[in-house]
Amino acid sequence: MSTLHVLSHSPFGDDRLNSCLRLIGTNDALLLCGDAAYALQPGTAPFTALNTRGLTLYVLAEDAQARAIDVPGWATAVDYPAFVELSIHHDKVNSWT
């Protein structure tokens, strides 16, 4: 069973990203959207935490672009139709609100 974890809040405002990383399974994936895209800023603790985990990571392309975030090679930028496909592909979707 796999879960798509969706984060939309800045990793610098609360501990949701760290909580998610503690619970995420090997078959799960993480999608960053909205201000959660700031987790991909190089040189930050969230960037390092995501990079070292080796997890399946997606970011909404338009949210990364709107925040001038370059998507690293270990993450995949997706559009909204791909977000829907990811939601269908996984058994569950967990939105960290």
Describe the function of each predicted region.
Residues 3-16, 34-39:
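Short, glycine-rich nucleotide/cofactor-binding loops
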Residues 14, 43-44, 77-80:
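Structural motif corresponding to alpha-helix initiation and N-cap regions
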Residues 18-20, 45-46:
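A short acidic, amphipathic alpha-helical/loop segment
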Residues 25:
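Short conserved AdoMet
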Residues 37-53:
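N-terminal beta-loop-helix "entrance" segment that forms/cooperates
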